[in-house]
Amino acid sequence: MSFSAKVKGEICRYIDISKEEALAQISAIMKVCGTLAFSGRQISFKMTTENPASARLMFTILKDYFDIHAKLMVKKSNSLKKNNIYMVVVTEEMGVKKLLEVTGILREIDGIMSLDYHIDENLVDTEEKKKAYIRGAFIGGGSISNPEKTYHLEFVTHSQEYAEDLGKLINTFGLKAKVIQRKNSYIVYIKEGEQIVDLLNIIGAHTALLELENIRIMKEMRNNVNRLVNCETANLSKTVNAAVRQVESIKLIEREIGLARLPKNLREVAELRLTYPEESLKELGEMLEPPVGKSGVNHRLRKIEKIAEELRTGNF
């Protein structure tokens, strides 16, 4: 089961809600996955989904809150996946006109009916109604990627005005949803992991939220470990390169003028480095008598490298 299906399965269990919340939720579902059909003077409205839990919820809300016994039909998809497509149909005899009016989908102005692509403010004038509306929009046209791979949550709509209204509604909760056009659709999307967690909380997908949070924590831990390993590898590489460079400089001095020509403090460090090429500066310093700190050993080795460089260039 996809992560999207898990989220929808969880939030479709929210059936014990107020009539106002149910109205907000079904309005959002109808706006994002509904189609208005005309046959002569008769009109009907069809909601389409590939998710059986979503279809059951649409049917249940219409029956329990609006006393509408919609038709529930199933057909095979023409796509390669061959999934079932579920259609919830409300006809004129069932009261589709009244439903379209109360959900803010149809508006009658001067006796003329027209589609309203905006979100009716009366449907989302409380916190709970806003949450129910966003939940409905996700049930009807939302999806979320597998969080193991990437963080991406989106709502697909077919109206720019509606997409912008939905984005603004989501952002009243402090989120940063954005709108883009993709072919003939308008997408409201969120890509940041923490914001997706917040949206799952808003729509009531608490089990999915915990699963995503666990995945986020594990990914962050893996990233931190990788960064630490990379950092330690880089530091080790620098230390090894420095030791190799120091040994080469000391051997050059030994070849050209002999280590005996070096001052005692430099000669002692040079001899230790030749004997213990893999030891750290701290460990070399502890071998000296009296012991010398890491910075002191580093200072002496720099002087040795400077002498070697002067020998290479003939300036000694």
Swiss-Prot record:
Residues 280-313 bind DNA. Keywords: Cell cycle, Cell division, DNA-binding. It holds the Pfam family LAGLIDADG_WhiA. InterPro entries: Homing_endonucl, Intein_endonuc_central, Sporu_reg_WhiA_N_dom, Sporulation_regulator_WhiA, Sporulation_regulator_WhiA_C, WhiA_LAGLIDADG_dom. One of its GO terms (molecular function) is endonuclease activity. One of its GO terms (biological process) is regulation of sporulation. It comes from the Bacteria. NCBIfam families: DNA_bind_WhiA. Involved in cell division and chromosome segregation. Belongs to the WhiA family. This is Probable cell division protein WhiA. The gene is whiA.
